[in-house]
Amino acid sequence: TLIIGWLWWLLAGYNEIEAHILGEHHFSVLIVFFTLSVAALALLSAKIQWTQLARVGFWLLPLTCVLAMSNFGEALFIGYDVYPSQGWGLLALLAFVLVQYRFLWRQREISSCGLLSAFHVLTAWFLFSLVYWEASHWQRELQWYGTNAAILWFACLVVPLVALLSLTNKSIWPFAQYSADYKNLIPAPLLLGLLLWFIAACHYSGITDQFYLPILNPLDLAQAAVLIIFAYTVKRGFIKLDS
């Protein structure tokens, strides 16, 4: 009965949004709809002491992922100008992040550790994918190619990786409780992407429209930074590179 009611609510809300909201706002409005629905049920669950109701929160990530993949597919294959920060997208995604991690925190002593571990990994990977979707949009919009594009993708890969390197040794949730996930699984696509970036960057000269200085130009400095980051990840035992 709970699942039937939840599915009915989602379908009714989706139809209302499709009927009354402009197409360019569908992505952000649907995320807000999913997020507020989960947040409201979580509050109701605590109010009436019905823990099973709060487990509807496990739907938030899959729903948002399906929505994002659908919109990304439309942007990629149909040519619609859709990207995460469009309209109220950033505020909607901020609400999603807050509710998602609040839900995972509240479930830490209720649900199985394996299930929560998987959701931490998948949530982080989903957030990474949104960053790369956003970056690919602005790369096309600003027509950045060659060295400019290489620096853009360097930043997209390095910033979250450096954040993980600085946070995984903190004794705070969720990094302390799920240290294996945040050191092994979550950074894996970042490190793989950075390795591929380094290989691709070796084929660029580093010359830009600005003043060019051999060795001390942005691309060469970025490549040096990658080597330092890889050395530090080995030292910190990320994805068990120190074994």
Model-derived regions, located:
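Alpha-helical transmembrane segments of multi-pass membrane proteins
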Residues: T1-S243
